[in-house]
A protein has these predicted regions:
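Flexible glycine/proline-rich, aromatic-decorated loop/lid segments
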Residues: 222-223, 234-249, 452-462, 466
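N-terminal Sec-pathway targeting helices
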Residues: 1-14
Length: 506
């Protein structure tokens, strides 16, 4: 009798679980507002012209390189500023637009809106780029040459397309007599690639000093429109970053005894440190799946996946351990679910026949938003479990927690809708950005921070980011300009129900 009762109970439990799984699988579909697609035949479509391309090429040819904190090419930053002012005369002469130069090189535009009761928003980009080694490129990285409809140059992706896209859109709108209802800001920092402490940080302080207490949302660079990156999904996936990983660089140091290699000690400084490094690499931090933006991303994308994957991704509460194991097998997906660890430097010894007196290694962690810097330090210390290995913090930054991405969150939905107006077959989803941006310098005036680049990427293109042969297609440049046009016009409304229609008068 007891056995029968147990069987009945098990069947009942399994039946309930099955019902819950199926209900979530077929009802967990994210909001998708109806939007009017942006078409080249529309009267307000911004067509790419030779003049637009030349302006973009010239911006790319200016070597606004940042090398390290405080070390950036000041003359080139001034040259780029001059180029922007010559290229966009309406932006720089309109009574609706006020430009302030911040910290000598960063640019803050204030655009007046007629309805001061509407909360302003902020569009950001950065003027600087990372260095490039010309010998490794197919084309010189600062000539902006065109081949097969692609423009090759450092900054084509990161992030002069943002600067030029925003200003091209605003120049076009002003030429059509656009008078915004909602006030907004545009900010271009000059040292984002070296943490933004001289540029965006000062811009953020300036906005706060003006008494700005709140932004409706902030849009900066970030994730992109991805093709073929997510197995099982055929259509493009546009990921909107709602959070950023933090980072922690730890120095591991061992002090040993010097001596001659003919009379070796039982353990040398290098040997002790090597064992510590092996322990770190052999013991990855635990999966944080379900505690950060990755959960929202997978649930948003589940409805685009084949049925089996859809069932699993819609029910992470049940299948989370399985997904964590699968994701742990490959570096790109492993980085989504946990704090990752990289041993980046190892130094020890001065001569082949001399025992090293000390050894040093550097560990870089990219921290999941669900964990703190101190947690990671404590974890490493416990795993190493050797008092001879001294840990010290070289640099760190806390992770940025997730911004709201619900059905009624204005900023997220404006960005999502604008994306789908340009890339009509794309699906959008919130996600976690692995790198860091200038957005942290504005976190005191808004929590609605989003990170998205209007860049189309195919498998392999991710290596061009900060890498060799960075490029953007002319078609993608046109899409980027029209994306920012839609951001400005859509955000000008006072609610999500009033998305800009192409027939609307500006």
């Amino acid at each position: 009798m007891a056995c029968k009762q147990i069987c009945i109970t098990l069947v009942a439990v399994c039946s309930i679980l099955l019902v819950i799984v199926l209900v979530r699988t077929f009802t967990l579909v994210p909001r998708k507002d109806a939007v009017i697609a942006c078409k080249t035949a529309d009267s307000d479509f911004i067509k790419l012209t030779d003049q637009i391309v030349k302006r973009f090429q010239r911006a790319l040819q200016i070597k606004t390189i940042s090398f390290k904190r405080g070390d950036y090419n000041r003359d080139q930053l001034l040259l780029l500023s001059s180029h922007l002012e010559k290229s966009f005369p309406l932006v720089h002469s309109s009574p609706l637009v006020k430009l302030d130069i911040i910290a000598n090189y960063s640019r803050l535009y204030t655009i007046t809106g007629s309805n001061t009761s509407l909360t302003p928003y902020l569009l950001t980009a950065h003027l600087d780029v990372v260095p490039a080694i010309p010998e490794e490129w197919e084309f010189p990285p600062f000539e902006a040459q065109i081949k097969d409809e692609y423009i090759y140059a450092r900054g084509a992706i990161d992030f002069k397309q943002g600067i030029m896209g925003i200003l091209e859109a605003l120049e076009y709108l002003l030429s059509k007599g656009f008078k915004p209802n909602r006030p907004f800001y545009i900010a271009f920092g000059h040292d984002e690639e070296v943490t933004g402490v001289d540029g965006a940080r000062v811009v953020g302080q300036e906005l706060k000093a003006r008494g700005l207490k709140k932004l409706e949302f902030l849009l900066d660079e970030g994730l992109a429109v991805l093709n073929g990156f997510i197995p099982g999904i055929q259509k493009p996936v546009a990921l909107i970053g709602i959070g950023e990983k933090g980072f922690l660089t730890l120095k591991l140091h061992v002090k040993g005894e010097a001596g001659h290699s003919s009379m070796p000690l039982k353990e040398t400084a290098i040997g002790i440190l090597a064992k510590a490094v092996v322990k770190i690499e052999d013991n990855p931090l635990p999966s944080m799946l379900g505690y950060g933006p990755e959960k929202e991303m997978l649930e948003h994308l589940a409805h685009e996946m084949p049925l089996a994957a859809r069932i699993i991704m819609s029910n992470l509460w049940l299948f989370g351990p399985l997904v964590s194991w699968v994701f742990s097998q490959k570096p790109p997906t492993n980085a989504i679910i946990r704090t990752v660890t990289s041993v980046t430097m190892f130094n020890g010894g001065v001569k082949t026949n001399v025992l090293p007196s000390d050894a040093t290694a550097y560990i870089n962690h990219r921290i999941h938003p669900a964990q703190s810097i101190q947690e990671i330090i404590d974890y490493d210390r416990a795993i190493i479990n050797d008092d001879r290995v001294k840990l010290s913090v070289e640099d760190s930054m806390v992770a940025a927690s997730g911004s709201p991405s619900g059905e009624n969150d204005f900023g997220y939905q404006i960005i999502s809708n604008s994306i789908r107006q340009i890339w009509t077959n794309a699906t959008t989803a919130p996600a976690l950005l692995f790198g860091n941006t200038d957005t942290r310098h504005y976190s005191m005036i808004t929590k609605n921070i989003y990170r998205f680049c209007p860049t189309v990427m195919f498998l392999g293109d991710e290596k061009r980011f900060h890498g060799i042969n960075e490029r953007i297609s002319k078609k993608n440049l046109e899409q980027a300009i029209n994306f920012y046009y839609h951001i400005i016009t859509n955000a000008d409304e006072n609610s999500l129900t009033n998305i800009h229609q192409h027939s609307d008068e500006l």
